[in-house]
Swiss-Prot record:
Taxonomic lineage of the native organism: Bacteria, Pseudomonadati, Chlorobiota, Chlorobiia, Chlorobiales
Alphabetized Pfam families for the sequence: Ubie_methyltran
Name this polypeptide is given: Demethylmenaquinone methyltransferase
HAMAP family: MenG_UbiE_methyltr (MF_01813)
Role description: Methyltransferase required for the conversion of demethylmenaquinol (DMKH2) to menaquinol (MKH2).
Organism name: Chlorobaculum parvum (strain DSM 263 / NCIMB 8327)
Family annotation (PROSITE patterns): SAM_MT_UBIE, UBIE_1
Protein family per UniProt: Belongs to the class I-like SAM-binding methyltransferase superfamily. MenG/UbiE family.
Disulfide links within the chain: none
Keyword annotations: Menaquinone biosynthesis, Methyltransferase, S-adenosyl-L-methionine, Transferase
Length: 241
């Protein structure tokens, strides 16, 4: 096993906050470029889908307050900021990712910290969103409890994650791309090759569909649904407090 794959395997097992933060600090300079390249630009569409659902939910609110957790370079926060009257806050553990987010979106407020213990008051937000980040939480169950805690009654969490297709043929093609092609392409542009060995393994290890909605309900959400997107290569979870 290569040192890159060994590092990725170790990170999957520990999900150490400091190691995750260091990984994202390292990939920050090429993160946006590779995200769009490796998803063929479809990642932008997935964010729009989540923002449209959130917009419908907060319709009638004069100033909907939205928290985007694991905001990274801020793209999902920016999609949410297009909701009329929205006041959006981005939150992430990586200072390097946040530095890019602040340059890209100076009108959005960004804060640094860990999802498992957020500095926001109970019932502060109408919406909590997270794009491609919750599978990296050191303590997933505690992170979801925090999502629930900071939401207002009736508020919703919108969580986007990669999905392994259930169709056998699609699954086989997806895993070939994810495990063999993607890391090689990423290695041409990013100095952190292990991050793209970590990615497919983290997706495989993450509880998918019904398994994750069960965790959301255990965190206190009264309703949790999922919506597969783009041939089941991505999935949107919507959880209602």
């Amino acid at each position: 096993m290569s040192s890159s794959k060994e590092t990725a395997k170790s990170l999957i097992q520990t999900k150490s906050r400091s190691s995750i933060r260091n990984m994202f600090d390292e990939v920050a300079p090429t993160y946006d470029f590779l995200n769009h390249l490796l998803s063929l630009g479809i990642d932008n569409y997935w964010r729009v889908v989540a923002a449209k659902k959130a917009r419908k939910q907060v319709e009638g609110e004069r100033e909907p307050k939205i928290l985007d957790v694991a905001t990274g370079t801020g793209d999902l926060a920016a999609s949410m900021a297009k909701i009329p009257g929205a006041k959006v806050t981005g939150y992430d553990l990586s200072p390097e990712m946040l530095a890019i987010a602040r340059k890209k979106y100076p009108n959005i407020e960004f804060h640094e910290g860990f999802a498992e213990k957020m500095p926001f008051a109970d019932q502060s937000f109408h919406v909590v969103s997270a794009g491609f980040g919750v599978r990296n939480f050191e303590d997933l169950a505690q992170g979801m409890k925090e999502f629930h805690r900071v939401l207002k009654p009736g508020g919703c969490a919108y969580i986007i994650e990669p999905m392994i297709p259930r169709n056998p043929v699609m699954k086989k093609l997806y895993l070939i791309y994810f495990k063999n092609v993607l890391p090689k392409i990423a290695g041409m542009f990013s100095k952190s090759t292990f991050a793209y060995d970590y990615l497919p393994n983290s997706v495989e290890q993450f509880p998918q569909a019904e398994a994750f909605t069960k965790i959301l309900k255990q965190a206190g959400f009264k309703k949790a649904e999922f919506f597969p997107m783009t041939f089941e290569t991505s999935i949107l979870y919507v959880a209602t407090k």
